[in-house]
Amino acid sequence: MCYRETGDARYLARAVKSAEYILNHPNLPKDGVPYWDFDRPGEERDASAGAVIASGLLELSEYVPHEQSRRYVRAARRILRSLSSDRYLNAAGSAHGFLLSHSVGHKPKGSQVDVPIIYADYYFLEALLRYRQLD
């Protein structure tokens, strides 16, 4: 978003560096939905982080060379498929209307751990819309 609004190449470089860090992290699960902390594999997954990553990758794919763009779109699609599975997506009419379960807000304080969180739904819908609008 910073690059889109400013055109400052430093923002694009930082976004690419962040994306590469995430996608190449040895503790990133195969389905693309990260643990609440990359340094704590095997603990709770964080659907909200997955949704943010998917949305960010799809936006970033608009500003990078074609091959890199394809890689980011594939990674975002993998995350969206995972989040759309029964593991993360709540059944209609359940979970008080939340779309996604299994998000983490503040694990060190024991707050919002393995629960639905509204911003997870927001970024999930944003990512789905971005994916749908791909050329």
Question: What do the PLM-derived regions correspond to, one by one?
Answer:
Residues 1-135:
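Glycan-recognition and catalytic cores of secretory/periplasmic carbohydrate-active enzymes
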